[in-house]
Amino acid sequence: MPLLNEVARQRAIIYRWFSQLLFQELSDEGLLRLRDKENLALLNALKLIPELSLLVTHFQRRLRAMLKREECRLELAADFASLFLLPAPSGVSPYAGHYPHTNSPEERQALRQKLVEHRLAPQNNEAVDHIAIQLALMTALIEEGVEREQQDLFLNRHLLSWLPLCTKRCYQRDRFGFYAAAMGLLTGFVQQDSEWLIACRLATHPARPGQS
């Protein structure tokens, strides 16, 4: 594995954090991690990005409110199930293939092959286009030092093509608001990450006069 610079390391940590948050109902251990200093430091780091400041603040408010619930783990598990496990129109699908303008069957097969190559293929019949699995693959691409152009291509083909619509539906249907706030922050981060990758590419390979 290549030696990661600090920016790449932090990006991988953030994508892994979102993947773990959205994969399934949080365990007691998962809830404890949301309270720890590392989680606080991660959110504070994201808050330093101006475009994410309000999204982080909103997520922190929903997180604090969630942790004050009497049976917070059980109630949060119920929130997760009612939002992501129920079919539409009650729930919101966390699968890319359920949204328009996403990938073709051939591209989904290529995605499955990538997951096999990175030893991330789901073992429990989970579809490869689940949001958490795609975020885990993005983490692996960063950690393996895949070219930034390919990382941005992955973000746009497999995440940004459907995340905004998914997030909009979460805001409409998540009654408590914790997971909607998490999805809003995720979408904002992915958009900013894509813009950063583009800026890095332009700085490395500036357009020549006359090129668009």
From Swiss-Prot:
**What SUPFAM superfamilies is this protein classified in?**
TorD-like
Compartments annotated for it: namely: Cytoplasm
List the GO terms this entry assigns under cellular component, sorted alphabetically.
Answer: cytoplasm
Q: Which Pfam families match?
A: Nitrate_red_del
Chain ranges passing through the membrane: none
Disulfide bridge partners, by residue number: none
UniProtKB keywords: Chaperone, Cytoplasm
Query: What GO biological process terms does the UniProt entry carry, in alphabetical order?
Result: protein folding
**Chief location bin:** cytoplasm
The text of the family note is:
Belongs to the TorD/DmsD family. TorD subfamily.
HAMAP family assigned to the protein according to its UniProt record, in alphabetical order: TorD
What role does it play? Involved in the biogenesis of TorA. Acts on TorA before the insertion of the molybdenum cofactor and, as a result, probably favors a conformation of the apoenzyme that is competent for acquiring the cofactor.
What is this protein's name? Chaperone protein TorD
Origin species, per record, is Serratia proteamaculans (strain 568)
Tell me the name of the encoding gene.
Answer: torD
